[in-house]
Amino acid sequence: KASVGFKAGVKDYRLTYYTPDYETKDTDILAAFRVTPQPGVPAEEAGAAVAAESSTGTWTTVWTDGLTSLDRYKGRCYHIEAVVGEENQYICYVAYPLDLFEEGSVTNMFTSIVGNVFGFKALRALRLEDLRIPPAYSKTFQGPPHGIQVERDKLNKYGRPLLGCTIKPKLGLSAKNYGRAVYECLRGGLDFTKDDENVNSQPFMRWRDRFVFCAEAIYKAQAETGEIKGHYLNATAGTCEEMMKRVTFARELGAPIVMHDYLTGGFTANTTLAHYCRDNGLLLHIHRAMHAVIDRQKNHGMHFRVLAKALRMSGGDHIHAGTVVGKLEGEREMTLGFVDLLRDDFIEKDRRRGIFFTQDWVSMPGVIPVASGGIHVWHMPALTEIFGDDSVLQFGGGTIGHPWGNAPGAVANRVALEACVQARNEGRDLAREGNEIIREAAKWSPELA
């Protein structure tokens, strides 16, 4: 019989994976999980189970454990705190050694950290609240194709938020009518128009026709306004090869920016696309379709700030980030927390804003947050104040729903934005005087009135 110090059988995870005296290393990836254990399961066991199942552990002791150094490779639950105001919920902090992850692969990072552990029997619910990505790991990623400053230089637009608009109705228009709507919005004063996330290549409008008519609209609007314009051409497709074919065609048309649905399209496809965009001078707009499936529940899934960090590593120049005002859910402090994580280089830990770890991006380019979803001109003062200059304010129905049509809707948005930026620069309080500022501007602009 075998007796080489190996004992088969099931033992508590906490004996191996709960290490409250562990000192985290600068190279560790740190995770904050919100854990709801099943009744009767101690918090330490639940936290240790998460650390084990998302790193080296399995449900029983195996003899091949002796062939490697568990101490070097195992995840460790190093701290647990009860969630204030919630019964039987804990924040469990887990540290993962860097060697567990493939360099430059968001796909592998998520497969390890959240791949298997969420179906675990000992847990009633589990949510990944935040990740600390060490510079040693973030430096293995290209990050955004261009970033905020390069985008401003490409567009030659400074000192104000950018304006966008999603073309509506999002499905059903022919390519030519779609291009016409794009032209009217850009001609009226917007910087960008956008394909909706589910506009790919449907029977009523194939992608190539849409790309051609949109390119024509962009060039016509640029010639008439003297400003650089763009339309987010959605290149998301059923296969990566098809996606790259569409992006290549967009580049040949001279389009400045393309778009990708990064959660439905997948991180592997997104990172591939981001590398192509940097190599070929294309900006990359990211839509977060499907995010609420993952981040809506408060006690299970993954917080959007984690998806936002992952996107900054995988690559994208814009990403939708909720609005704080409008039709889609978003709490102000939390939203501002992940907006900073997208844009800034160094973000201090701040639990009030949901930031569990200090994050140092070591000069990785920033991502512009896009505010969209049920917003209109009366929200403009609040949006300008909350999001600041480095943002895209995206109005769909708020432009195209104008009683006079698309171009006047775009004019109204642009006038409102310029009025708010000027008022802010003159030192006025947008939060208090916002409505008054818009009313004053409306005296000079029948479209806004």
UniProtKB/Swiss-Prot annotation:
Alphabetical UniProt keywords: Calvin cycle, Carbon dioxide fixation, Chloroplast, Disulfide bond, Lyase, Magnesium, Metal-binding, Methylation, Monooxygenase, Oxidoreductase, Photorespiration, Photosynthesis, Plastid
Residue numbers carrying N6,N6,N6-trimethyllysine: 7
Pfam families: RuBisCO_large, RuBisCO_large_N
UniProt xrefs under CDD domains: RuBisCO_large_I (cd08212)
Subcellular location: Plastid, Chloroplast
EC number per UniProt: 4.1.1.39
Gene3D superfamilies: Ribulose bisphosphate carboxylase, large subunit, C-terminal domain (3.20.20.110), RuBisCO large subunit, N-terminal domain (3.30.70.150)
Cross-referenced InterPro entries: RuBisCO, RuBisCo_large_chain_AS, RuBisCO_lsu_C, RuBisCO_lsu_C_sf, RuBisCO_lsu_fd_N, RuBisCO_lsu_N_sf, RuBisCO_lsuI
Keyword tRNA processing: no
PTM annotation: The disulfide bond which can form in the large chain dimeric partners within the hexadecamer appears to be associated with oxidative stress and protein turnover.
Catalytic residues as annotated in Swiss-Prot or TrEMBL: 168 (proton acceptor), 287 (proton acceptor)
Binding site residues for Mg(2+): 194, 196-197
Cofactor: Mg(2+)
Residues modified as N6-carboxylysine: 194
Positions with a binding annotation for substrate: 116, 166, 170, 288, 320, 372
Cofactor note: Binds 1 Mg(2+) ion per subunit.
GO cellular component: chloroplast
Enzyme class, UniProt record, top EC level: lyase
GO BP: any one term: photorespiration
Catalytic activity: 2 (2R)-3-phosphoglycerate + 2 H(+) = D-ribulose 1,5-bisphosphate + CO2 + H2O; D-ribulose 1,5-bisphosphate + O2 = 2-phosphoglycolate + (2R)-3-phosphoglycerate + 2 H(+)
Recorded family membership: Belongs to the RuBisCO large chain family. Type I subfamily.
Miscellaneous notes: The basic functional RuBisCO is composed of a large chain homodimer in a 'head-to-tail' conformation. In form I RuBisCO this homodimer is arranged in a barrel-like tetramer with the small subunits forming a tetrameric 'cap' on each end of the 'barrel'.
Known role: RuBisCO catalyzes two reactions: the carboxylation of D-ribulose 1,5-bisphosphate, the primary event in carbon dioxide fixation, as well as the oxidative fragmentation of the pentose substrate in the photorespiration process. Both reactions occur simultaneously and in competition at the same active site.
Subunit annotation: Heterohexadecamer of 8 large chains and 8 small chains; disulfide-linked. The disulfide link is formed within the large subunit homodimers.
Name assigned to this protein: Ribulose bisphosphate carboxylase large chain
Species, as recorded: Aspidistra elatior (Cast-iron plant)
Origin organism lineage: Eukaryota, Viridiplantae, Streptophyta, Embryophyta, Tracheophyta
Encoding gene (name): rbcL
